[in-house]
Amino acid sequence: MKIAFVWQGVSGRYGFWKDGLYSAMKHIEEKHEVRYIEPWEEVMPDEIVLYWESACTINGKDGENYKRIQQLPNKKALLFAGGPVQKEWFFNFDHVFVEGEFNKQELYALDISCSIAFGVNEEIFFPEKQQKTIDGFMQATFAGWKRQGLFAEALGNKGVLCGRYQEEDQAAWLDSERAFRLPELPAEAVSKLINASHTVVNTSAYWGGGQRCTLEAMACNVPVIVMSDSPKNVEFVAESGAGIVCDPNADSIRNAMEQVKGKDMVGRDYIMSKWTSKHYADNLLKFIENA
């Protein structure tokens, strides 16, 4: 079968990430022909479309790109990248893949065909014996919904943030100056930083996503701390026991760090049981091979 994998940014940052989806698509390439394109590029009539995007993009500056893919006559699935949901945003997609149970139940309530497909690149993110030199780490684009300012308030210069600076959302960068900050780095470097950390502290808010950050920490057997108002991350910690949930304030975060620091974690076993790139690929293939 022929597949058009569509993502705005596929010609740049997608390859830089080498995340679970990148690795999942490499598995799919072993069985099918895959072409990686931007949403404004031509899609062939015989291609099955996999489109990675937030549905709310339809109302933003790139809305015309979203609508163009949405209106294609091809068989197509949306790989939902997070954010709010409205039923009409999903019209004309044959299926929607989500990253966890929270979003699946949201879409079920809207009577939208959906299933879970998600995971990490377990070949890059794995436990390594390293000296722990960082109290807390977080990898995420600097954005209001990631709350890097809260991370910096809780950890100060004992915390390390790593992510892309956004000119259009400068507050997260300006508010986090007390922490040590790094630009977006290749996956291999991020894995080294996770393994050098006592904890991963994911301060993402309700709409903040951050599930990849949570699962990559678990893949490295590093305790992850997530916020109680971030249900998409809470579900992974609750199911795995590989971390702790705390309230989104500096004192609660510091207390949580003390509770889990130095404890043996079972995150890697949890990842290998259901959240590897192979699991990710197999779930995508269920749609592709029945399209």
Predicted regions: what they are:
Residues 191, 214-219, 234:
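Short alpha-helical segment that forms part of, or immediately flanks, the ligand-binding pocket
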Residues 223-228:
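Short hydrophobic beta-strand element within catalytic cores of glycosyltransferases
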Residues 1-65, 282:
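N-terminal pre-catalytic "stem/leader" segment of glycosyltransferase-like enzymes
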Residues 14-21, 122, 131-187:
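Conserved catalytic-core segment of nucleotide-activated headgroup transferases in glycan assembly
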Residues 87, 107-114, 118-134:
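Acidic anion/phosphate-binding donor-loop and adjacent secondary structure
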Residues 247-248, 258-290:
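A charged, aromatic-enriched C-terminal amphipathic alpha-helix characteristic of glycosyltransferases
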Residues 195-209, 222:
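Acidic donor-binding loop of glycosyltransferase active sites
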